[in-house]
From Swiss-Prot:
Family the UniProt entry places it in: Belongs to the MurCDEF family.
Positions that bind ATP: 112-118
Source organism of the structure: Desulforapulum autotrophicum (strain ATCC 43914 / DSM 3382 / VKM B-1955 / HRM2) (Desulfobacterium autotrophicum)
Protein known as: UDP-N-acetylmuramate--L-alanine ligase
Location (main, coarse): cytoplasm
Annotated metabolic or biological route of this protein: Cell wall biogenesis; peptidoglycan biosynthesis
Highest taxon above the source species: Bacteria
GO MF annotation: an example: ATP binding
Task of the protein: Cell wall formation.
């Protein structure tokens, strides 16, 4: 991409994935504009970087545009998409734009059903600590830099490879890290076999000089290993992983473990994050860093001071000895993993969860799994389903989910109709020493922030 005079327009520019690419293009000198139905801190940042931001989608906003970028969240009936077609403006998916940017540098792509953002952040932090100043495109706000994109001067680009719609097959990374494979995104994939087939294609796209970094703890990755033709290494908590963690323990919100590479003990790591899932993510990042010849002492220092990503076990605050934590988890596996990490990090607290289901299609497809995901919570509130542009599905709602959770043995489940009623009950229920975990990929984090204001 060398046409710096291009005017690139993003439909839905405030999205976490779209905004990262937009910010990177701005830093490269392109003219960038875009629209979103809701202005936010993200769109404000883009405006401060030089982007023209429109509130709402209107056809007249794309009249002098060279390229229109969309995502799967944007309908074909969007007025800007229709206008672009009528004007013969080239329209491309977000993934294609990211793929073009990744061609500029030595590309490291991180994919998987869970842990992509955290792992990408860890790799970026380690490479930055090593003085390599990577370009970063990540699906979350990095606490260390306050944004989801960074245009580095170094030779590397580290980016999330989103598998949700198969678009990660557009990338051609030199290093491909896969954190796990899980049953997800069934609005696009037929079944788990279809998902595994796509991951095999992604992994085998790694060139002969590259490397695939694969989690041996995941049963679906275990299943596809015989089909992998790319050079690969494995990581995990398993004794059979090429890069493994030993002697895992937690103290407070920090994890401690020893890294073993084959038969060689590389050394001890103190991870400034809680949860075994984050140790697994750290192992993936360590494997990538070792492939790039980063010294272990640098890796150790980076992980000890890593700040993490917003909305990933993010401590929002504490009032009256009540702690409020927020997490993006919205899949049953993520729910269980996050609750386990909370129990490890805060073992003595009563855990009160406020869960906002995300998408009707996901709730329907994974309904049985959701009913058995919350046993580690002491008290559970379930909010209405966050539609995320979907239409309701008959027979799928939060009340049915609550009933299912209760039928599967959870004794303390409350179905609430909105934020206001949830906050009212919380105010009367919470006690000093409690931990409130807001959980979901929608806007449930706002409830946690409001709760802190009420408790002040």
């Amino acid at each position: 991409m060398y046409q710096k005079n291009y005017h690139i327009y993003f439909v839905g520019i405030g999205g976490i994935g779209m905004s990262a690419i937009a910010e990177l293009l701005l830093s490269l000198g392109y003219r960038v504009s875009g629209s979103d139905l809701k202005l936010s801190a993200i769109t404000q940042r883009l405006a401060s970087c030089g982007a023209t931001i429109f509130n709402g989608h209107r056809a007249d906003q794309v009249k002098d545009v060279d390229v229109l970028v969309t995502s799967t969240a944007i309908s074909k009936n969007n007025p800007e998409v229709i206008e672009a077609a009528e004007r013969s403006i080239r329209t491309i998916p977000r993934a294609e734009m990211l793929a073009e940017l990744m061609r500029i540098k030595y590309a490291i792509a991180v994919s998987g059903a869970h842990g992509k953002t955290s792992t990408t952040a860890m790799i970026a932090t380690i490479l930055n600590q090593a003085g390599l100043d990577p370009t970063v495109v990540v699906g979350g706000l990095l606490k260390s830099i306050g944004t989801n994109a960074h245009h580095g001067k170094g030779d590397y680009i580290v980016a999330e490879a989103d598998e949700s719609d198969g678009s990660f097959l557009k990338y051609a990374p030199a290093i491909a890290a896969v954190t796990n494979i899980d049953l997800e995104h069934l609005d696009f994939y037929k079944d788990i076999e279809d998902i595994k087939d796509n991951f095999v294609k992604f992994i085998n796209s790694v060139p002969f000089y590259g490397l695939a970094v694969l989690c041996l703890d995941n049963e679906h990755i275990q299943a596809i290993l015989p089909r992998i033709t790319a050079r690969y290494t494995t990581f995990g908590l398993s004794a059979q992983a090429d890069l493994a963690a030993r002697g895992i323990r937690f103290e407070g919100r920090r994890g401690y473990f020893t890294v073993v590479h084959g038969k060689e003990v590389l050394g001890d790591i103190t991870l400034n994050l809680s949860g075994k899932h984050n140790i697994s993510n750290a192992l993936a990042a360590i494997a990538v860093a070792l492939e790039l010849k980063v010294d272990f002492s640098v890796i150790k220092e980076a992980l000890e001071q890593i700040e993490g990503v917003k909305r990933r076990l993010e401590i929002k605050g504490e009032r009256n000895s009540i702690t409020v934590v927020d997490d993006y988890g919205h899949h049953p596996t993520e729910v269980k993993t996050t609750l386990a990490a909370v129990r490890e990090g805060w073992p003595d607290k009563r855990v009160v969860v406020v869960f906002q289901p995300h998408r009707y299609s996901r709730t329907k497809a994974l309904f049985d799994e959701f009913t058995r995901a919350f046993y580690q919570s002491d008290l559970l509130f379930v909010l209405p389903i966050y539609a995320a542009s979907e239409q309701p599905i008959d027979g799928i709602d939060s009340l049915k989910l609550c009933n299912g959770i209760q039928e599967h043995g959870h004794k303390n489940v409350i179905c609430v109709k909105d934020f206001e009623s949830c906050l009212s009950i919380l105010s009367d229920t919470l006690e000093p020493g409690d931990l409130v975990l807001t959980l979901g990929a929608g806007d449930v984090y706002n409830l946690g922030e409001t709760l802190l204001e009420i408790l002040a």
